[in-house]
Amino acid sequence: MEKQINDLNVRNIFLKKILIFFLAFLFFFLIDRAAIYLTDLALTGSFGFTWLSLHHLIQIVMAVAIMLMPGRHRSLSNWGLNFKNSDVTLKIILKFTIGWIIGTTIFTLVTQWLSGWPPLLDFYLSIENILIYLIFESIIVGISEEIVFRGLVYGTLSPYFSNKVKIGFSISYAGIISAVFFAIAHIGFQISPFSITAFAPMQIFIAFALGIFYAVLREKTGSLLGPILAHNISDGWLSILYIVIQLITHGN
């Protein structure tokens, strides 16, 4: 009898974990789909980064609304929206920023030189477009995507996938899963008819690697401050670098 009860408990725990896994997936997937639909209603045909800015702002509202739903019994601070361990965060971010700027600058310049300096950006570099692009990449994107992935998704998974693995550093299974979902989110597709519209292996790999780093930072500090700053710095610096290279090599 005791063995049967234990087996039943194990099965129930397993089924609950499967349910939570798919719930976390549905959160980011449906938030993205709903934000796409609502943004298209207002900004179809607009400048791409204007569209993305509204899309990501809608994502923030929807993710926070889910966090605040009755019955969740968690404050926004528990979801990571706090300034805990900010001194630790800033020390890590400083090291990350230096390494990221040096590494990505060298990599981008070398790959651009080897490939004959092709255009990095597919829009006209007017002052308005540059400002919208930089605001999105250096402010909005990190806040939105980290609230969704290291906030809502990770926070949903963490009570059930809290066991950690050590691979040179310590990270929970919740952190790994959130990084996988983050990488999947960088694959473009349409539902009807289903087709893959964008698949860049290098971009997906980098998204996964950065997702792991953001998750480790989230777990180390208990806050989304670090992941948001790191995300905005990583995307923001590349945006500045791309603009400078494009202006020098192509003039617009």
Model-identified regions with their sequence ranges:
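Short, Lys/Arg-rich, polar N-terminal cytosolic tail immediately upstream
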Residues: 1-12
